[in-house]
UniProtKB/Swiss-Prot annotation:
Keywords: Isomerase, Magnesium, Metal-binding, Phosphoprotein. Its cofactor is Mg(2+). The gene is glmM. GO terms for cellular component: cytosol. One of its GO terms (molecular function) is phosphoglucosamine mutase activity. Activated by phosphorylation. NCBIfam families: glmM (TIGR01455). This is Phosphoglucosamine mutase. The keyword Metal-binding applies. Binds 1 Mg(2+) ion per subunit.
Length: 446
C-alpha cells in the first residue's frame, strides 16, 4: 500500500485515514526527523474539519511516544504552519488538512525545519519506516523519555505580523472595500484580521466553521456567492480562499472571476516593475495558458514550466533561483515571503497592485486575454504509457502544425485521460478535439 500522494497523505477520515494510521505515521515521521533533530520539538496545525480532533490526538500520541515534544497551534492556514515551523525553531511541522476537499476527507502533510514541504524521496523514507515493525517497536520511549504536548494559543500574532510585512509599508488599504470568503476554513480568523488591520473595509463570508461546512458551497472552488456579494455591496474586489488558505481566487468589482493565469501574469509584472522579481523568471505548470508566456515575454520575463502541483512549482523555483511561481488553480508562491502557496499573501499583493496602478480590478484583468482552451475528460479502459501509444507522436505533431498546444495526461485517481488543446481559433480547436477523442478512444479502449 502506498501512503503518500501528490500532497502528503490524504483520504476519507475514519476509513483510509484512521486514528491508527495517523498514530503510526506520526511515529514513523518522528523516527525520520530524529536523525537531524536540534530542538526535539514538532509543530502541529490543522484546518476546521471535525476529524481534525481525532487525527491531531493520534499524531500527538505518536510523536510523544517516540520522544518528541509537540506544540499544537489549532486551526491555522497551511502557509502559517510552514512559517511557524521555522520561526519557532521546530524540527518539523505537520499540517492536518485535505485543502479544498469536502469535510469528510482529511490529510497529513509534513514540513522540514526550514518550512519546506518534504520531497518524494523524504516521504518515501517515512513510508519505509512506517511499514517496518522492527523500527517502530524499537523507537518507543518509556518513562521520562516520553515527550510532552502543549497547546500554544498566541502564535496567530506572529503570522499576522509576518503577512503584513509582505505588504508595502508605504501603502494602505483604507480606500478599498473588500469581500473575503474564508471557506469556513483555516483562515477564518487570520484573513479578516489582516485586512482590517491594514485599513480595508472588510466584509467576511463563510467564517463560521462547524466541522462539516468547510468548502461547502463556498471558498475558492465555489466563488459564485462571493461574486454575488461583491456586486451587491459594490465592493472593489473579492478574495476566496480554500480550506487551508494556500489557494486564492479573485473576483473583480463586476463579479467576474479573474482567470488564474491572468493573476499570475499581473503579479509577475508587478514584481518586475517593483524590482523584486529574481532572475526575470517565473515558474508555471504545463496547464498554464500560452498567453501568459506571450504577455510576460514582452516585458522580459521567461516562463519555466513544470508538472502540476505546487510542490513541483516550488522545487523548480529553488532550482532556477526564481522567487515567484504558481498554478492556474490559484496556488501562488511568493518565495520572498512564503515556502508554499499563501492565499492571503497573494490577495495582499493583488491589492497592492490595484493601488499602485490606480486601476480597478476589472481593468487589471483585461491586461491579459487567455487563448481559448478546451479540456475534456475521456473514460478509458487501460492506461497504456503515452510513449507506447502507436501513432501518438505523429498525431500530436499534426495538431501542433496548426498552432495548437497539446497536453494529454492520465488522471491519478480515475480511469480517465485528460485532453487539453489550446489555440487562437476556437472552431479549429473543437474540430481537433473531436479527432483527439476518436484517436484515444481507439488506442485505449481495446
Amino acid at each position: 500500500m502506498k501512503l503518500f500522494g501528490t500532497d502528503g497523505v490524504r483520504g476519507k477520515a475514519g476509513n483510509f485515514l484512521t486514528a491508527e494510521l495517523a498514530l503510526r505515521l506520526a511515529m514513523a515521521a518522528g523516527v525520520y526527523f530524529r536523525k537531524n533533530s536540534l530542538t526535539n520539538m514538532i509543530l502541529v496545525g490543522k484546518d476546521t474539519r471535525r476529524s481534525g480532533y481525532m487525527i491531531e490526538t493520534a499524531i500527538v500520541a505518536g510523536l510523544t511516544s517516540v520522544g518528541f515534544n509537540v506544540r499544537q497551534i489549532g486551526p491555522m492556514p497551511t502557509p502559517a504552519v510552514a512559517f511557524l515551523t521555522e520561526d519557532m525553531r521546530c524540527d518539523a511541522g505537520i499540517m492536518i488538512s485535505a485543502s479544498h476537499n469536502p469535510y469528510y476527507d482529511n490529510g497529513i502533510k509534513f514540513f522540514d525545519r526550514t518550512g519546506f514541504k518534504l520531497d518524494e524521496k523524504e516521504e518515501a523514507e517515512i513510508e519505509k519506516i512506517y511499514f517496518s515493525d522492527k523500527i517502530i517497536n524499537e523507537a518507543r520511549k518509556q518513562m521520562m523519555e516520553i515527550g510532552t504536548a502543549k497547546r500554544v494559543d498566541d502564535v496567530i500574532g506572529r503570522y499576522i505580523v509576518h503577512i503584513k510585512n509582505s505588504f508595502p509599508r508605504s501603502e494602505t488599504l483604507h480606500n478599498l472595500r473588500v469581500v473575503i470568503d474564508t471557506a469556513n476554513g483555516a483562515s477564518y480568523k487570520v484573513a479578516p484580521t489582516i485586512f482590517k488591520e491594514l485599513g480595508a473595509e472588510t466584509i467576511v463570508l463563510a467564517n463560521e466553521p462547524n466541522g462539516k461546512n468547510i468548502n461547502e458551497n463556498c471558498g475558492a472552488l465555489f466563488p459564485q456567492n462571493l461574486a454575488n456579494e461583491v456586486r451587491r455591496l459594490r465592493a472593489d474586489v473579492g478574495f476566496a480562499f480554500d480550506g487551508d488558505a494556500d489557494r486564492l481566487v479573485v473576483v473583480d468589482e463586476n463579479g467576474e472571476i479573474i482567470h488564474g493565469d491572468i493573476l499570475l501574469g499581473i503579479l509577475a509584472s508587478y514584481l518586475k516593475e517593483s524590482g523584486e522579481l529574481a532572475n526575470d523568471k517565473i515558474v508555471a505548470t504545463v496547464m498554464s495558458n500560452k498567453a501568459l508566456d506571450d504577455f510576460l515575454a514582452k516585458i522580459g520575463i521567461s516562463v519555466i514550466r513544470t508538472n502540476v502541483g505546487d510542490k513541483f512549482v516550488l522545487e523548480k523555483m529553488r532550482e532556477i533561483g526564481s522567487n515567484f511561481g504558481g498554478e492556474q488553480s490559484g496556488h501562488v508562491i511568493f518565495g520572498s515571503f512564503a515556502k508554499t502557496g499563501d492565499g492571503i499573501v497573494s490577495a495582499l499583493q493583488f491589492s497592492a497592485c490595484m493601488i499602485k496602478m490606480h486601476k480597478k480590478s476589472s481593468e487589471i484583468s483585461k491586461m491579459i486575454k487567455p487563448y481559448p482552451q478546451i479540456l475534456r475528460n475521456l473514460k478509458i479502459k487501460n492506461k497504456k504509457p503515452l510513449d507506447k501509444i502507436k501513432g501518438l507522436d505523429e498525431f500530436e505533431k499534426n495538431i501542433q502544425k496548426d498552432g495548437i498546444r497539446t497536453l494529454f495526461r492520465y488522471s491519478g485517481t480515475e480511469n480517465l485521460i485528460r485532453l487539453l488543446l489550446e489555440g487562437k481559433n476556437e472552431k479549429l480547436l473543437n474540430k481537433k478535439m473531436d479527432e483527439a477523442e476518436e484517436f484515444f478512444s481507439k488506442a485505449l479502449n481495446d
